[in-house]
């Protein structure tokens, strides 16, 4: 499947609409996220490696906010526990349709992959099966802040002893100087990947009302409040990080 370059915000828009994961975004999403999120390929590949340590035979592995299924593909490449299956969930019909196409292509290239179920659903209303691994890769930041604790609490209840939640998020920082520095470095990263000042400004306008990052401290406190016993940051690149939360 051909991957198109992200030019969604390359032309001046009279009014910049809020960002949505529609068909236009789906077409360019692999290019967009690679050029926008520092360390993204490293996070995705190692999510599978981490999951292999925590996956337990006969359990569900969740990819919540699966988008095009990059994390699901990583889980299927690395996890070998008997009887496991991946449940990939996204609320965007366009994402789900393309995700299924990518996973079908993966099935044609590899043997003995974990079975996968792709659901178009709202994770806030999703009943969770007993799970040994739950991955949320840049998903929680799009959930309304007042609904995040309840969601994490339900995930904690579904996690089996010895399992793990792997949570990746964009961070904000309480220290103003630290926030300004890492924000500017992130903008430099985007410029180095070919985004113009117009594209950067219009994308920021589109996403600022729908994505609400938290501080690392807020994530840690919320995860503990949800019932997790240990929170371990395992990766950070600029203002993007990933955590392992243990039940």
Swiss-Prot record:
Q: Which domain of life is it from?
A: Bacteria
> Per UniProt, which keywords does this protein have?
S-adenosyl-L-methionine, Transferase
GO MF terms, alphabetically ordered:
carboxyl- or carbamoyltransferase activity; S-adenosyl-L-methionine binding
Name the enzyme group at the top EC level. Answer: transferase
**Any Pfam family hit:** Methyltransf_25
Give the GO terms filed under biological process for this record: tRNA wobble uridine modification
What residues does S-adenosyl-L-methionine bind to? 40, 65-67, 90-91, 122-123, 137, 204
In the UniProt record, the signal sequence range is: none
* Gene3D superfamilies for the chain: Vaccinia Virus protein VP39
**Documented EC number(s):** 2.1.3.-
CDD domains to which the protein is assigned, alphabetical: AdoMet_MTases
What is the reaction catalyzed? prephenate + S-adenosyl-L-methionine = carboxy-S-adenosyl-L-methionine + 3-phenylpyruvate + H2O
Family in the record: Belongs to the class I-like SAM-binding methyltransferase superfamily. Cx-SAM synthase family.
The protein's role, per its UniProt record: Catalyzes the conversion of S-adenosyl-L-methionine (SAM) to carboxy-S-adenosyl-L-methionine (Cx-SAM).
> Quaternary form?
Homodimer.
What NCBIfam families does the entry give?
carboxy-S-adenosyl-L-methionine synthase CmoA, PRK15451.1
Q: Which PANTHER family match?
A: CARBOXY-S-ADENOSYL-L-METHIONINE SYNTHASE, TRANS-ACONITATE 2-METHYLTRANSFERASE-RELATED
Which HAMAP family has this protein been placed in? Answer: Cx_SAM_synthase (MF_01589)
Protein name (Swiss-Prot/TrEMBL): Carboxy-S-adenosyl-L-methionine synthase
């Amino acid at each position: 499947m051909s991957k198109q370059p992200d030019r969604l915000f390359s032309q001046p828009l009279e009014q910049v609409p809020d960002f949505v994961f529609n068909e236009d975004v789906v077409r360019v999403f692999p290019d967009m996220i690679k050029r926008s999120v520092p360390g993204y390929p490293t996070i995705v590949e190692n999510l599978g490696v981490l999951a292999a340590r925590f996956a337990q035979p006969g359990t569900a592995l969740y990819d919540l906010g699966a988008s095009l299924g990059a994390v699901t593909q990583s889980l299927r490449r690395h996890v070998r526990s008997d009887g496991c299956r991946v449940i990939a969930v996204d609320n965007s019909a366009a994402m789900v349709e393309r995700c299924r196409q990518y996973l079908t292509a993966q099935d044609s290239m590899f043997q003995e992959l974990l079975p996968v179920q792709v659901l178009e659903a709202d994770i806030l209303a999703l009943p969770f099966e007993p799970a040994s691994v739950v991955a949320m890769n840049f998903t929680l930041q799009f959930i309304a802040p007042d609904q995040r604790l309840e969601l994490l609490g339900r995930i904690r209840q579904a996690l089996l002893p010895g399992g793990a939640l792997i949570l990746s998020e964009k961070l904000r920082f309480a220290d103003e100087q630290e926030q300004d520095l890492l924000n500017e470095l992130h903008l430099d990263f985007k410029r180095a990947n070919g985004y113009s000042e117009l594209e950067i400004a219009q994308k920021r306008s589109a996403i600022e009302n729908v994505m609400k990052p938290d501080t690392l401290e807020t994530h840690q406190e919320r995860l503990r409040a949800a019932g997790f016993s240990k929170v371990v940051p395992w990766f950070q690149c600029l203002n993007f990080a990933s955590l392992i939360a243990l039940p």
